[in-house]
């Protein structure tokens, strides 16, 4: 004859079963969650990819975001004309005295323009866009490294944008530049999984925050701008990789690549070199040893445009020794990919993709390829447990 449980014991046993069931449910749910980190230096196209994810898998942009984008897009345009004006004023491009007045206004008082009444701001934008010297600039110097990439999209649309009734399209928001400060996370369902995509600022001052998100990462999506090969940024005396102060420092060998670095300028660092060194530092991080690495070699379209007039070997002399050292997009892209693979451990894999983040279908397709790899690896891992 069995021993009957008293009521308190029956209640406790039932509660334990309930807790165990809940734990099993949560464990199963956690196995379906994929944590992805989106990393890269500033202006690599990270935020554009996040916006594409929102368009493809979330609800896109709300009304408030669309209205706010009006001012951000116009500020993007004013900022672009600021840099263009500075270059024209310092060039041999012919400009009349009247044109010089407008160029100097944009070059040296762009912030004042941004603070003007809308009618005055639009009048100035519409005035500068039709200047003869601006047309000459775009004909000969449109891919100068100081010019923001998105002006190539916005300039042909200025007649539509520079009116008081303007309302941004989804395409406009995709091309809009906005510096990522802090951490932004979106979650969405993809097939049978829940994706947590975490985007952290690419500015050097923001990188110290990255370490807090390295634990439990399934995949790292690292974005590099292929078109940054002829761009430079100021070199800071402090360590660019802030987390290294508390973790194992990156070995010096990664800073001397057999593929070679760019020609150095005093006090400056090539942005492509900066991207490669940052990627290697992340890949060497102990927290991410078991993570999948997806390398987005972005802005393939802009690379092609630049290579029409710029010789890659003039910026990376080691390219002369490359197998196919012509100035083609394919050859240059393969060389750049090899820079990221330098010093790769035998058991580490990098899945590289050529991307154009401003094209929705391109990112949708590439993201699908990445997820196929990640999901298959997850299945392999779970089958071993």
UniProtKB/Swiss-Prot annotation:
Region described as G4 motif: 294-301
Lipidation positions, renumbered (N-myristoyl glycine): 2
GO terms for cellular component: axon; cytoplasm; heterotrimeric G-protein complex; neuronal cell body; synapse
Keyword Metal-binding: yes
Protein's name according to its UniProt entry: Guanine nucleotide-binding protein alpha-5 subunit
Keyword Ribonucleoprotein recorded: no
Lipid group attachment sites (S-palmitoyl cysteine): 6
Sequence segments annotated as region (G5 motif): 355-360
Start and end residues of each stretch annotated as G1 motif: 35-48
Keywords, alphabetical: GTP-binding, Lipoprotein, Magnesium, Metal-binding, Myristate, Nucleotide-binding, Palmitate, Transducer
Region ranges (G2 motif): 172-180
Transmembrane region(s): none
GO MF term set: G protein-coupled receptor binding; G-protein beta/gamma-subunit complex binding; GTP binding; GTPase activity; metal ion binding
UniProt binding sites for GTP: 40-47, 174-180, 199-203, 298-301, 357
Residues of the G-alpha domain: 32-385
């Amino acid at each position: 004859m069995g021993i009957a449980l008293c009521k308190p014991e029956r209640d406790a046993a039932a509660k334990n079963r309930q807790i165990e069931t809940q734990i099993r449910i949560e464990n199963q749910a956690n196995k379906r969650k994929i944590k992805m980190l989106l990393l890269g230096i500033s202006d690599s196209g990270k935020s554009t990819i996040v916006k594409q994810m929102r368009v493809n898998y979330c609800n896109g942009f709300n009304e408030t975001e669309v209205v706010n984008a009006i001012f951000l897009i116009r500020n993007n345009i004013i900022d672009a004309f600021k840099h263009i004006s500075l270059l024209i004023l310092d060039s041999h491009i012919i400009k009349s005295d009247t044109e010089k007045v407008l160029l100097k206004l944009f070059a040296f008082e762009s912030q004042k323009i941004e603070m003007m009444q809308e009618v005055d701001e639009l009048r100035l934008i519409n005035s500068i866009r039709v200047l003869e010297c601006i047309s000459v600039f775009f004909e000969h110097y449109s891919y100068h490294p100081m010019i923001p990439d998105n002006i190539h999209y916005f300039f042909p649309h200025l007649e539509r944008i520079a009116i008081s009734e303007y309302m941004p399209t989804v395409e406009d928001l995709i091309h809009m530049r906005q510096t990522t400060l802090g951490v932004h996370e979106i979650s969405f369902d993809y097939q049978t999984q829940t994706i947590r995509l975490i985007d952290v600022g690419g500015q050097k001052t923001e990188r110290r925050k990255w370490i807090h998100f390295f634990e439990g990462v399934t995949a790292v999506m690292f974005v590099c701008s292929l078109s940054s090969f002829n761009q430079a940024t100021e070199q800071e005396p402090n360590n660019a990789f802030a987390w290294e102060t508390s973790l194992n420092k990156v070995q010096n060998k990664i800073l001397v690549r057999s593929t070679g670095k760019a020609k150095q300028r005093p006090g400056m660092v090539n942005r492509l070199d900066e991207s490669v060194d940052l990627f290697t530092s992340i890949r060497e991080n102990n927290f991410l040893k078991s993570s999948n690495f997806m390398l987005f070699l972005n802005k393939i379209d802009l690379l092609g445009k630049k290579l029409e007039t710029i010789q890659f070997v003039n910026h990376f002399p080691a390219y002369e020794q490359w197998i196919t050292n012509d100035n083609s997009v394919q050859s240059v892209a393969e060389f750049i990919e090899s820079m990221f693979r330098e010093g790769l451990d035998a058991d580490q894999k990098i899945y590289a993709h050529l991307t154009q983040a401003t094209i929705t279908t391109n990112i949708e397709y590439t993201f699908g390829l990445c997820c196929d790899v990640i999901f298959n690896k997850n299945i392999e891992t779970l089958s071993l447990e």
